[in-house]
Amino acid sequence: MGIIREIFGHDSKGENIYSYTITNESGMTIRVIELGAALQSVETADRNGKYADVVLGYDNVKQYETGNGENFGVVVGRNANRIKDAKFMIKGKEYRLAKNDGENNLHSGPDGFEKKLWKVSEISEDKNADGTVRLLRMREDRR
């Protein structure tokens, strides 16, 4: 059981992107990365004890940055799914969003949470529980 922090790669700005690998007492391992708070891999045993990665995830930072519209394991937002015509209304006020899926907005457009760098706010290795890595995303205007 434990948590390992290591450099996963570098983003297009040259910043280090870290991964955090957590292993429990049963040998199950998950890896999250700071870019998009992505769940990059989950390795667990099948009924025969053979371990395999059971989630889709990219192998490097560049693939997460470009993504080709695939949001493997990332946190999407501020909105998730499609917003028709890239606009919506709240209390009579119309809000317009970037069009990135034909005439629609998909998963917040080109600058959603999946493209943001999330920072670790807590790492906990409690011997009575599995490890915890807590990722935090603050709005730029609230730093």
Please give the residue ranges for each predicted region.
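Surface-exposed acidic/polar loop and edge beta-strand patches at domain peripheries
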Residues: 1-143
